[in-house]
Amino acid sequence: MSKENVVADSWDDADADPVKELMDKVEKVKLLQRKEEKKEAFFEKVKAEESSGVVSKLQTEEGLGPSAEEPKRVFLRRPKDGFAASENVIEASPPTSADTEEQPVTNVRSRSHHKLNQKEKQPAPTYEERQAAYQAARNRILGTEYKPDNQEIKEIKFIDRSKSPETLKMTQQNMVEHYGEELSRELMEQPAEIVPPERQYTPDFTQPPPSVSESGGVYNGPPGFQQKQPNFQPTLQQQSLHQQQYLDNQYMMQMNVQIPIQYHNQTQHQFVPHEASAISTTSQNSNGDGQNDQAIYYYQAPTQQPMNYIPYNLPNMAYPPPNFQPQGQLHHQMNAGQLHQIQQQQQQCQQIQHQPPQQHQQVINGQVMNQQNQRNQVNSYPQQNGAGRGQNRQPMMYQMPCNSGPTAKPPPLMNQMQNRCMTNNGQNYQNRNMQQQGQQRSYSSQPQNGQFYQNGNSNQNNPNNGRKQQHQPQQQQNKSGKFGQNRNDMQKNNYQPNLQQPPMSQNPIPFGCPPRNVNAIREQHANNGSPNTGAGILGPHPMMSASQWPALQQNRPQ
């Protein structure tokens, strides 16, 4: 056998001698054949011994002798013709001492065949016997006192089919008629697969939360709630209070209306200028001067698209709903006498405003501040006496007048929470007045940098609230002296404990106010002026990546 004709079995042993490997394989095959022959010879020998009944002598310790009785070894082998002859397999029965070989093969059958033969031999029980056996078993199980309810079983009628043999015509009445009430109720139920799965409200982490940019630290409630004064645009000249239209829904007011607010340069909202035709420029003020021709900017709330089924406009049910009345009812409760008294107080304020500076400084600590507060309380509603927009640029819920006298009572919907927030507003207006005190500008008809002068816009600091000043230089000196006096009043009144307030019976902030630490955090953000990237105090959401929140690369508030 030459090396060229032999093919190696594997790549590993290609270098080995192929002839030698082939010879090794031949040797292995011969060894296996020899083993098989020895095994067959052993089986033949055992069969011959069993047939002769000679017990082989085993070598014991004493030498060759008869050993103890060995158990008989039975080799169960598979029949050569497959399982066809398995019914006639002879079971090995324990050998008896007398006749081991004379056992008839016919008696040895499987147990199942034995039982079948026994059943065939017995006659079938009659109906009476079966009834008696049933009664005995029932008495044994249920007791002798058991009496069955002999109810008539309705025969189920055959259900008529429709033209298509696959669909059944089945109505509720048919079901009740055929199957009874309970079973038909179960049958008419929808299967569990058709039940729609519950919608999971997963928050949308792709957008940062809205930034808190107001310096007052006021809790702005859930996004669907009306937070600031709505913009009431009168279409006709309204002669009486009853012709005005109010929003009476105190729980949810839509944020689609445009809202006039004051704003700073740090806010990131959209401000839409409106032409003068949308606003009644000849609205009658209570003082008779219709100077309302400044261009007014309106805050348009950014429209929020509902993503992932987030209900933006639902009220927050973790807090009780507010129990205050809508604004329309508050105004309708005012009678004519109160309105007349309010107009008289406003005329008195106008007379005191034109006094020389010495008298003005003497009077302003007493009765004038109280009248100013009452005027502020009335004018905080933008609907009063026509749309007096020049006077009321502050939203009502966010402004707290200084309570300096014993007769000053807070306006409705105000409580201690507003007084605490007012300390920030007072400081901001003081700083603004200190910056612009030496400049002494007259108001121009156009806003500068898209922003109003904040100099006279607060009701606390100047009774000339938002109107143009076209008086003599003496009036401007009066204004500068009065600013210093008012600043001292602000410091005294804001840091005094306010003891004249009645116990709080109404909830001015719609869904409760935040705890003190949240207020402090928001005030700290507003005072630092750091850009609120939405990451919050604890950093971004742990499951967020920086690519989903690109604003996080800026300096984060500490």
Curated annotation (Swiss-Prot):
GO terms for cellular component: centriole; centrosome; chromosome; cytoplasm; nucleolus; nucleus. Residues 69-81, 117-131 have a biased composition (Basic and acidic residues). Disruption phenotype: Temperature-sensitive with embryonic lethality at 25 degrees Celsius. RNAi-mediated knockdown results in 10% embryonic lethality at 20 degrees Celsius and 90% embryonic lethality at 25 degrees Celsius due to cell division and cytokinesis defects including centrosome duplication and attachment defects, and failed bipolar spindle formation in embryos. RNAi-mediated knockdown in a zyg-20 (it25) mutant background results in suppression of the embryonic lethality phenotype in the zyg-1 single mutant at 24 degrees Celsius. One of its GO terms (molecular function) is RNA binding. One of its GO terms (biological process) is regulation of centrosome duplication. Residues 94-109, 478-508, 545-558 have a biased composition (Polar residues). Residues 50-132, 205-241, 374-558 are annotated as: Disordered. Its main location: cytoplasm. Keywords: Cell cycle, Cell division, Chromosome, Cytoplasm, Cytoskeleton, Nucleus, Phosphoprotein, RNA-binding. Coiled coil: none annotated. Phosphorylated. May be dephosphorylated by let-92. Pfam families: SUZ (PF12752). Residues 45-146 form the SUZ domain. It is found in: Cytoplasm. The keyword Endoplasmic reticulum does not apply. PROSITE patterns: SUZ. Residues 374-394, 424-477 have a biased composition (Low complexity). Interacts (via C-terminus) with atx-2 (via C-terminus); the interaction is RNA independent. Interacts with let-92. The C-terminal part is necessary for interaction with atx-2. RNA binding protein that is required for normal cell division and cytokinesis during embryonic development. Functions with RNA-binding protein atx-2 to ensure embryonic cell division, and to this end, plays a role in the regulation of centrosome assembly, position and size, and in astral microtubule outgrowth and nucleation. Furthermore, negatively regulates the levels of the protein kinase zyg-1 at the centrosome. Also involved in ensuring centrosome attachment to the nuclear envelope. This is Suppressor of zyg-1 protein 20. It comes from Caenorhabditis elegans.
